[in-house]
């Protein structure tokens, strides 16, 4: 399960259209969709508040208003889309959601990161722009009261605010 905003949501939207028109492409449609999306500015804005946990289990808050980003993914799985891997160490049963966000970047900086994002090694390759962590809940909300285009498990949504949390059963 992955909820995402930004670049990857746009890739998913275009990839689904390509796959609908050319079904034999299958998941390769998402790899093809990366090209037109990368030709657009890779800069979006959102307000974010996350209840996070560091690697030692200590809680902390991640709060940014008017945050600029290229991609933001909240993950309870390692892979999504056409095999992209934003959270290589994600575990379904650990009570945590992994998150990955990428700062705004130029096309020249983005091009070498994309295959590494697909392989799950982007954070190691570009730690100055690819950031990761763990969360148990939080919210995303619009900076201008317009709906945010997001995606959850292949389904697009557009809300001005989204809240989420991990519930143990």
Model-derived features: where do they sit?
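Long C-terminal subdomains/extensions of small-metabolite kinases
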Residues: 1-169
């Amino acid at each position: 399960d992955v909820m995402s905003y930004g670049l990857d949501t746009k890739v998913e939207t275009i990839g689904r259209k390509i796959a609908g028109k050319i079904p034999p492409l299958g998941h390769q449609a998402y790899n093809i969709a990366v090209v037109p999306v990368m030709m657009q500015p890779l800069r979006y804005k959102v307000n974010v508040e996350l209840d996070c946990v560091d690697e030692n289990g200590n809680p902390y808050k991640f709060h940014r208003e008017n945050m600029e980003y290229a991609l933001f993914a909240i993950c309870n799985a390692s892979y999504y889309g056409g095999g992209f891997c934003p959270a290589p160490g994600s575990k379904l049963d650990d009570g945590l959601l992994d998150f990955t966000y990428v700062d705004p970047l130029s096309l020249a900086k983005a091009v070498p990161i994309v295959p590494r994002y697909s392989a799950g090694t982007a954070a190691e390759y570009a730690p100055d722009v690819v950031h990761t962590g763990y969360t148990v809940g939080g919210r995303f909300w619009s900076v201008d009261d317009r709906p945010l285009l997001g995606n959850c498990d292949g389904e697009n949504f557009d809300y001005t605010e989204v809240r989420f949390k991990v519930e143990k059963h």
